[in-house]
Structure formats: structure tokens, C-alpha cells
């Protein structure tokens, strides 16, 4: 248009109509040498929720459409924080920005500042159909769509800022080739709290909230208690049965009932108790105690060899169990029907087993099976002292008056002692002292090793092979009818080791006190005092007795066979045999009571 204008101005003298026609022709058909470009952003302000998609639109106009321009999107941070200013509108900075905007209507304090004081990054570049992302946005789902639209498929923290759209063309150098759009990314806040995904709770009344909290607390403590009982059944204090596992009780109910029955005397409903107290009206007399004895030599196996009472002195047949299942049935006590392999029940099993055998001294129900039952805690059928690992220290033997005056090897007899030096009268005053009750039995056999010497050949007695069998009970300790019990056949060195009971506490002594046969014998020697025997028994130690027992047992096991039964004697009358049988039977019953 510049040449046309100069041509119209350079013809002042021509016809005016011709001049106007030429000017219009030049204006219409003569183009300019360069055209301008225009870039615009329809929506310069965007607010989007985090992780939501957004598109920043950008359009441009240019005169040359033969070549495609280069579209560049740049990111520049805000000069001031819009979110902070929105929450504090009365701040000094906000008031200053308001004054600047009022004085300059086109001024924007959040966008207009130098690039050196803010962050500048290239987001994406497009030339033709090729889109290239900047280094900071590699891997993000960002692209340029249409002519120059920037699209975010998912926004992120830090995307808030100012995005500039620039269009560069080599042929269109004039015009406005840049425009910007503001983007603010906010976090999502819901109007009502979400308890569950997709579920929104509306306004809740105060009283309803309190009820819900109380019910939740009660349910929590209930579940906690049930779980505690299931994990620790031996320490729980709640006697309830869990519905999740009814076969396994969460408390030792059977053990609790059994212990209560054992202490209060009420019979248990789980198992018959042998330790509960009986009512006074139904209390039976105490049954005779069983004394397991050692079998005599050469007799059947109805005797228990491993059981002993009082140093193997009394021997009586054992009352054996008729049914083996009875013993196990009684010993089982209070049984909890549970798996013994379960770790949580092992302690319970041990406790109820100990409770079942808690106090064997209490009498049980008056039946033969329970009376014959033995406790697993303490029993007369335990191993004897020879098999125990620990032994009591032996006490020093105490000598008597006779021991101090005479040597143990002295052959002096009791008839040679003056009467004033002998003890005062009492039962068995004419008998020498022995080391044990078994030694008293050996005194009756002059040929035995316990007597210390053999009987004289003039006495006409039988030797060891023809001696009667040794008695292991206290029934045959002394027989006044036997001539072997005369004082001249005893050795005085056994006087120091006599072991017996107090004649006043022994029921057999009371029985003998009424026996006219013993009265005649005691009258012959009234100088013996039975209290001296009791005093000697209290002073004797266990070591000497055990040594004598062990030596005697080793000697018998090594080279001696059981003696033969005594031969039949024509001199023994029928009355004498019957009298001895009655006496042995009565004393055997007394030994059972003892």
C-alpha cells in the first residue's frame, strides 16, 4: 500500500477521476511485503482438583499458511502465592497489590515479574505433528492437541503456575505471538467424612454418637476377654464358654470344681473324689493300714519283696489289686478330657494330676477298691532306702551301762550278772539287746550268724539247717514255750542294738500283759525296766541299722538258700500247734493295724 499511496500523491496535475481509480486499483491488488501474527488464550484462569485432567486452550492467526509454525508451552511460577493471599486478604502485601492494581488497571502482581526471581521450565514443543516434552516432564501424560492446546491427563502437586503459549513463524515476524493462562491445582476436600469408600455419613445426633461409642467399647472388651481366655486358659478368670470353639473350654472348669469339692467336702460331678470329707453320720471306721512285707524264704510269691515298713521287720501277705483298671481309674482323679499334646493344656494336666493325689492321708469312700488304691505322690510301695540317691547321715551309736562294763565279745551270760546291776523288771527283761527286730528273731536260732556263737552241743538243739523259718513280723519275737528263749542262750553284746517299740504304746504289749504265760516269766526277773529300751531306741541312728541290714542281705544273697521248713515233731502236741496258730493269726492282724 505504500507504493500505491506514493503514486496517488505523485500525480497532482492529472484528472481527479483517473487518480482515484488508479489508487483503488493499487490498494486492492498490491499486497504488503510482511504480515503480523496474533496469539490468544480464550480462558486465562483455570482451577482444577488434584489428579484431575485439564486442557489449556491456545489459538493463533497468521497470514502465511504454507508452512506450519512452532508452538512452545513454557511454565513460570507465580510471582506471589495466590492461595496464601486468598487466606489472608487483610495482609500488608495484599493491600499494596490492591493499590498498584488501582493505579495501573493492566497490572497483575502474580504474573508480572522478572524471570530471574521465579522458576521457568519448557513444558512441551510441537512442530507439525511431532510433540517433544521437556526434561522435567518426561514420563508425564502431557501433550499438545489441536493447533496449540496443552492437555494434562492428570495434574500433580507443583503444576500450579503460569503457562505461556508462544507461536513462532519465520514469515510472520510482527504481531503478538505470546499469551498466558494461570493454573491452580487444589487438593480435594469432601463435604462429609467418608467412613467407607463410596459411603458418606450424614449429620449424626449427639445421643446416637454416645450410644454407638458405648456399644463399640463393650464389644471390644468382650472380644478381648474371650481372646485372652483362649490364649491363656490357665490364667483366665472368666468362666464362659466361647461360641467359636465349644469343644474347648476357655477356663479350667473341671479343675475348679474338683478343687472346690476337695476343700469343701462336696462331691464332684466330674469324677468320684477319694479325698473329700465325709459326713459324720456316714464316716466309716478307719480301715486297717496295709503293711507291704518282704516274702519269707522259700514261700510263694504272695509277698512283696520291694515294700517294707520298720526296717523289713514285719512280713505279711499283700492285698493285691483284683482289677488293674481300678488302680488307674482311681489314680486318674479329676480328669479334664482334653488333648495332652496341646501346649496350653499341659499345665492344667499337671495341676489336676497333683490335685488328684493331693492328700492320701484322708480316708476315701468305704469300698475295697479305693482303700487298696495307692497315691502317686506318696505310697508305701516306693523304693526302699537302698535305692534312694540321698541318705541321712549316720549317728554315732550310744553305749549302755552293760556295754561300758563288758566287752561285746565277752562270753559272760545274763545269769552271771548280779541282780543289782541288771535293769529293773519289765517285759523281756531276761532278753539280750539286739540291733533290730530281725536280730531278735535270729537270737531264737542259736545256729544263726546273728547270735554271735553256736549253741553248746549238750543243749540238743537243731542247727541252722533244721532251724524254723525266720519270721519277718513282730508276732514271733518271743515265745515263752520255746526253750531256746532261755537266758543262757543269748549273747549280751546285742543288748545295745535292740530296736523295738514302747511297750506302753504297743497293743501287743497290752495283750501280753494279760497273758498268764508272760506273767510267770516276768516274775522270775523283775529287775528290767522297759523305759531303758525306749530310751535306747530314741538314741540309735539309722546308719548302724542300714549297715547291718545290708551285710545280712548280701550274705544271704551270696551263699545261702532258703531254709527248709521245720520237720514234723512228734513231741509237739495238737493243742500246742493250735495255740500257736491262733496266736500268730491274732498278732498278724495286729501288724496289719500297725
Swiss-Prot record:
Any one Gene Ontology BP term: protein localization to tricellular tight junction
Residues in Ig-like V-type domain copies: 89-181
Cellular-component GO terms for this entry: bicellular tight junction; chylomicron; low-density lipoprotein particle; plasma membrane; tight junction; tricellular tight junction; very-low-density lipoprotein particle
Function field: Probable role in the clearance of triglyceride-rich lipoprotein from blood. Binds chylomicrons, LDL and VLDL in presence of free fatty acids and allows their subsequent uptake in the cells. Maintains epithelial barrier function by recruiting MARVELD2/tricellulin to tricellular tight junctions.
Cited SUPFAM superfamilies: Immunoglobulin (SSF48726)
Biased composition (Low complexity): 445-460
Record note on modification: Phosphorylation at Ser-308 by MAPK8/JNK1 and MAPK9/JNK2 may be required for exclusive localization at tricellular tight junstions.
Claim: Phosphoprotein is one of the keywords in the record: yes
Name of the protein this chain belongs to: Lipolysis-stimulated lipoprotein receptor
Family matches, as PANTHER family: LIPOLYSIS-STIMULATED LIPOPROTEIN RECEPTOR, TRANSMEMBRANE AND IMMUNOGLOBULIN DOMAIN-CONTAINING PROTEIN
Residue numbers carrying Phosphothreonine: 283, 396
Subcellular location: Cell membrane; Cell junction, Tight junction
